[in-house]
């Protein structure tokens, strides 16, 4: 019986690891769309806003403001509407975790 419990626990941990790996890969796919303007992993070229290492909460607020139309923009209000609030939160966390 102990072996079954250990086997189930190992299986759950394995599935959690696979799920987390798939989630970070999905976030990287979303972040790749940002690279056109903000550079790879948020390291922008001169003249564009870098996202790497920015405060997560401030970045999320800015994204939500773009999405709602509170913050004027040429493209970001359209781009941000293509993501759920949760996806925007995950993107903000991803870029905040990148080294400047």
Can you name each region flagged by the protein language model?
Residues 1-8:
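Bacterial N-terminal signal peptides that target proteins for export
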Residues 9-12, 35:
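Short N-terminal leader segment in a subset of presequences, especially plant chloroplast
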Residues 11, 68, 81-100:
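C-terminal capping alpha-helices of c-type cytochrome domains
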Residues 14-31, 47-49, 60, 65, ...:
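Electrostatic cytochrome c docking/interface patches
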Residues 27, 41-71, 77-83:
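Gly/Gly-Pro-rich "capping" loops immediately C-terminal to redox-active cysteine motifs
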Residues 32-40, 91:
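The canonical Cys-X-X-Cys-His
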């Amino acid at each position: 019986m102990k072996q079954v419990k250990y086997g189930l626990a190992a299986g759950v941990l394995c599935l959690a690891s696979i799920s987390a790996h798939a989630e970070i890969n999905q976030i990287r796919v979303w972040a790749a769309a940002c690279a056109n303007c903000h550079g790879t992993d948020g390291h922008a070229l001169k003249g564009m806003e870098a996202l790497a290492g920015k405060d997560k909460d401030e970045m999320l607020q800015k994204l939500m403001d773009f999405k709602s139309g509170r913050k004027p923009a040429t493209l970001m209000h359209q781009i941000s509407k293509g993501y759920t609030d949760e996806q925007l939160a995950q993107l903000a966390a991803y870029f905040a975790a990148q080294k400047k």
